From Swiss-Prot:
Disruption phenotype: Has normal vegetative growth, inflorescence and flower morphology, however has smaller anthers and does not produce mature pollen grains during reproductive stage. After stage 6, during which anther forms four somatic layers, the three inner anther wall layers remain undifferentiated. Meiosis progresses normally from leptotene stage to metaphase I, but is arrasted at anaphase I and no cytokinesis occurs at prophase II, resulting in degenerated meiocytes. One of its GO terms (molecular function) is protein dimerization activity. CDD domains: bHLH_AtMYC1_like. Pfam families: HLH. This is Transcription factor TIP2. Residues 173-186 are annotated as: Basic motif. It is found in: Nucleus. Its main location: nucleus. InterPro entries: bHLH91-like, bHLH_dom, HLH_DNA-bd_sf, MYC1-like_bHLH. Belongs to the bHLH protein family. Transcription factor that binds to the E-box-containing promoter regions of the transcription factors TDR and EAT1, activating their expression. May have a role in specifying the cell pattern of the inner anther walls and functioning in meiosis progression. Required for male reproduction. Acts downstream of UDT1 and GAMYB, but upstream of TDR1 and EAT1 in pollen development. Residues 187-222 are annotated as: Helix-loop-helix motif.
Amino acid sequence: MYHPQCELLMPLESLEMDVGQSHLAAAVAAAMPGELNFHLLHSLDAAAAAASSTAASASSQPTVDYFFGGADQQPPPPAAMQYDQLAAPHHHQTVAMLRDYYGGHYPPAAAAAAATEAYFRGGPRTAGSSSLVFGPADDESAFMVGPFESSPTPRSGGGRKRSRATAGFHGGGPANGVEKKEKQRRLRLTEKYNALMLLIPNRTKEDRATVISDAIEYIQELGRTVEELTLLVEKKRRRREMQGDVVDAATSSVVAGMDQAAESSEGEVMAAAAMGAVAPPPRQAPIRSTYIQRRSKETFVDVRIVEDDVNIKLTKRRRDGCLAAASRALDDLRLDLVHLSGGKIGDCHIYMFNTKIHSGSPVFASAVASRLIEVVDEY
């Protein structure tokens, strides 16, 4: 079988080692290059040792072509010549010859002895013959000085690695385990964000952080609206109670005065005094106070209500002329304009409205803010 190192011995093909010419083995070894594997030297030494102990015919004499597989070389008869493992003296002789040839560049004695003994105890041989077996031309061990070692065969699967995207954290598939639960959790969270986004009026942005911020402001606004409506209902109820108490007191005082007038004239004076004393003192109603802030992409509204006074701050970006639309919205809400001021800061137009609520008008802060944003954004 062909070996790349055999090319180094092509100039030595003409040399023949006849029976009884063991001195030629040393000459051939001295002429070999340093890159040659020492297994070939061992083969030549084995041929010389076998030639000194066995007589053979001229037709069966081993040559260099015999060891390296010449093109016209026929395999020898099985019984003509057999090569066995060298004895211990030949081992040491071959190692010493290699060490002298390399001139001190040979590996340390311990490593060389271990490598040599590993080969001499039974190197790779073909079945039924004693010729050396060289690896294929593409084997890495063919270009190394030392015992033959076959490189591991590559994996047939293509060597693809599993990534964490195709395999679970614990070896499971992507549809099982932690990744499946995480995917379901994210889907539920996205559905909740979408539902919350639909409940918020006048959203500024669509990202999750802004949605949460708008939701917090809207919840606080709803709480203030509930308090404001509660105060309005309580105030209206107290007004009705006060009107009912005055009517009842006046009726009872008139009946008592008529009874006493029949008896004496002094009873009329006492009835008049009793009529003035029957009217209960007015109760102090709770003060109505609330505020709301609403914003859209280009509009900001701040509404503050204290009793019947409504103070409105309107901020509009990148566009002027929205004052007429805001005035029409205040008229629709039945708010009387008391004072108006305005200005411009950068690209923002700011207006301040001081208004009053009509008596009996059910106006609250959230309705004012929503109406102003709706009208100004459409302008």
